[in-house]
A protein has these predicted regions:
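A short, well-ordered alpha-helix in the C-terminal region of glycosyltransferases
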Residues: 317, 324-338
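Conserved donor-binding/catalytic core segment of Leloir-type glycosyltransferases
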Residues: 182-202, 208-212
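Membrane-proximal helix-turn-helix segments that form the acceptor-binding/catalytic region
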Residues: 121, 127-144, 150-151, 157-158
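Carbohydrate-associated surface elements
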Residues: 41, 150, 169
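Acidic anion/phosphate-binding donor-loop and adjacent secondary structure
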Residues: 153, 167-187, 231
Length: 364
């Protein structure tokens, strides 16, 4: 199958949607399909050959965060060339509600179109402005996918459609291979955080306040771009490569996700579980779903969103109780396997098969 994939967010900055798209493309290529990806990217971004660089992007506040999106005549030109030269059997647009390459591709393309919805909510003025234009465009989509029940519910309620639920995928083997055996771990318990440091909804300050309540010797590693703090006992390592991320998660004992909102999935929770971390997360609906919180053997501990006191209490329990920590690790490893790309990509291909009809995607 000849597959074209469109990403709205810049590949110059790391992000969950970008990582999802690149991983999906690699899995599809390994299965023998022809795949090309289009999205914003500057000339200096290190990207695989299957990515078509869409050029510069601008930071725009969108869905409670700051996303790097592209606008202007060059976007229309790049999309038209991508569709015309690609001769695709199916076009897979991610976040078609996003006013960047994705929205332009949806407006311009005709033929078999699949869309994946990642966002679960948005107070974006940009989206409100484009909503009247979006509704008729969304009718062109033949197959819809939502990465979480939250994303699916929001799409149905706000813009219509009936997407199927297919979660984000993770190459769990990469993180499992990085896992350091428990018997080889020495020193104090290591706690890890990953997220943009200057984005308040990622919750770093909640974790830092919680640490002041913990009267235990711990090692703390913070990954992510932004302004580091000067805090004794906390190692700010900055933005890291995928390899270094896997290595840090693989040696760590506890991964903390103190996010306060704007999350529809939580892919890094799955990565941490696969790497052998016990996961502690805020009780957002998306995180509760990933942690299988209502089951007899949950894959993560939840704390009240925004409560550094509650987070400190949960961390103290896991620091003191090694057996409880290891039970979470085992449950997390089992849970992570349900998100492996081998099953996720198979479900995505099934959606492709329902829309491909022998016609070719073209630009109007």
């Amino acid at each position: 199958v000849r597959i074209g994939i469109v990403c709205p967010y810049s590949f110059d900055e790391p992000g969950g949607v970008q990582a999802h798209i690149l991983d999906l493309a690699r899995v599809l290529l390994e299965a023998g399909h022809h795949v090309r990806v289009l999205g914003p990217a500057g000339k200096d971004a290190e990207l695989p050959d299957f990515v078509v660089r869409g050029g510069r992007s601008l930071p725009i506040r969108y869905n409670g965060s700051v996303a790097r999106l592209s606008f202007g005549p060059h976007v229309h030109a790049r999309v038209r060339d991508f569709l015309t030269e690609g001769r695709f059997d199916v076009l897979h647009i991610h976040e078609p509600n996003s006013p960047s390459f994705s929205m332009v591709a949806l407006w311009m393309a005709t033929g078999p179109i699949v869309a994946t919805y990642h966002a679960s909510s948005s107070g974006s003025l940009v989206l409100r402005f484009f909503r009247p234009v979006l509704r008729p465009m969304l009718e062109k989509i033949r197959g819809g996918i939502a990465v979480s029940e939250m994303a699916r519910r929001w799409q149905v309620e706000q813009l219509g459609g009936d997407p199927v639920l297919i979660p984000n995928g993770v190459d769990t083997s990469v993180y499992a291979a990085a896992r350091v055996p428990e018997a080889e771990k020495t020193g104090p318990v290591e706690i890890v955080f990953l997220g943009r440091l200057d984005e308040s909804r990622k919750g770093l300050d909640i974790l830092l306040r919680a640490l002041t309540r913990i009267d235990r010797e711990v090692r703390v590693t913070v990954m992510g771009g932004g302004r580091p703090r000067q805090i004794a006992g906390v190692d700010f390592v900055g933005r890291v490569s995928d390899e270094d991320k896997a290595a840090i998660l693989g040696r760590a004992d506890i991964y903390v996700a103190p996010n306060t909102g704007g999350e529809s999935f939580g892919i890094v929770l799955v990565e941490a579980m696969a790497a052998g971390c016990a996961v502690v997360a805020s009780d957002l609906e998306a995180f509760a779903a990933v942690c299988d919180a209502g089951s007899e053997e949950p894959a993560g501990l939840l704390f009240r969103t925004g409560s550094d006191a509650d987070l400190a209490a949960q961390l103290t329990c896991l620091i003191d109780d090694r057996e409880a920590r290891l039970r979470l690790v085992d449950a997390g490893a089992r849970r992570a396997r349900t998100y492996d790309w081998t099953s996720v990509a198979r479900d995505v291909l099934t959606v492709y098969e329902t829309v491909v009809d022998g016609s070719m995607v073209s630009a109007r």
